[in-house]
């Protein structure tokens, strides 16, 4: 006999993965003092491995974990950090089907976001 909360196929609703998530691609941070935040990342074992060509944005990596530090002065991330302190300003999830996950999120009430991609940048749909 299956518990009342299980599906007939044996799966459990709490374990379903309708968005097809498969981990995190990156977590993006901003801080009023980006130099101090970068130093904290390095003390935690992260290495600065790449910098954006035209913006004050740095990629830190430790193993398979990616942190992005956004120090771009006129960005939403920096304006938010100046008001609220060190903050996570974006999270990128790995998904099996990006289009399907995006459409499902919108169908569930998420709002789409389209940033302003600069030269040589990708315009990636976001929510």
Which residues are covered by each model-predicted region?
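Vicinal oxygen chelate
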Residues: 1-17, 21-32, 61-71, 78-127
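Membrane-interface interhelical loops and short amphipathic "cap" helices
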Residues: 49, 74-80
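Short, structured motif recognition centered on aromatic/hydrophobic residues
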Residues: 23-28, 41, 46, 60, ...
